[in-house]
Amino acid sequence: MTHPKELPFSTLQFYATAPYPCSYLDDRQARSQVATPAHLINADVYSELVKNGFRRSGIFTYRPHCDGCEACTPVRIVVDQFIPNRSQRRAQSRHSDLQTSVTKLVYLAEHYDLYLRYQAARHAGGGMDQDSREQYAQFLLQSKVNTRLVEFREDDGTLRMVSIIDVLDDGLSSVYTFYDPDEANSSYGTYNVLWQIEQARMLQIPYVYLGYWIEESPKMSYKKNFQPLEALRRGEWQVLP
């Protein structure tokens, strides 16, 4: 893992949080390394931070800094080498009629309602299913970098999915996506990643950053379906077998 003093961020400071319960692996404690001050982390600086394994939640920019654990692995899709597999092609075909709208960050009650439904169905008991409007906005609608909100709707206007995406100098960073949980085996999440890959191709930027992958976490297993996938290990990006 690259040490902050080796990064070209002489105006930033980095500190480690106190331990807290890990969100991904049961019975483990996690810590984060946080980049501050937030007002100095603009789009260019954030792009470099992402290349070095950082992510953001609202204006909170961090990377894992756990004692004795390196399970969280930053991963990114190599756009110009990606070829969809059969199930991904099915997802592409199934949802190709969805209408997309790319906007700046904005609060809509319709988005918030979908977010709560998604959390209640997919992450019940995790705390986020009880998020207030203020917590939702702090998590997804506060950004000091180049961020877009993407709506996916049916022809009749029915909202199916919302995605928050950061535009970096070398790729797109998938911040968070939530979708209609009422359709079983909808493959909305897969379609969303495919959409981001196509957007990166159009923008002629080489990567789609998917955040962290944990081998032991079933919730993250879908990320390995997008090949070739690169992982940041010991400060170097390398193809993940």
Curated annotation (Swiss-Prot):
**Keyword Acyltransferase recorded:** yes
Coarse class of the protein's main subcellular location: cytoplasm
User: Keywords, A to Z?
Assistant: Acyltransferase, Cytoplasm, Transferase
Reactions it catalyzes: N-terminal L-glutamyl-[protein] + L-leucyl-tRNA(Leu) = N-terminal L-leucyl-L-glutamyl-[protein] + tRNA(Leu) + H(+); N-terminal L-aspartyl-[protein] + L-leucyl-tRNA(Leu) = N-terminal L-leucyl-L-aspartyl-[protein] + tRNA(Leu) + H(+)
Q: Which NCBIfam families match?
A: PRK01305.1-1, PRK01305.1-3, PRK01305.2-3
Q: What is the purpose of this protein?
A: Functions in the N-end rule pathway of protein degradation where it conjugates Leu from its aminoacyl-tRNA to the N-termini of proteins containing an N-terminal aspartate or glutamate.
UniProt lists the family membership as follows: Belongs to the R-transferase family. Bpt subfamily.
Name assigned to this protein:
Aspartate/glutamate leucyltransferase
User: Which organism encodes this protein?
Assistant: Herminiimonas arsenicoxydans
Q: Which gene specifies this protein's sequence?
A: bpt
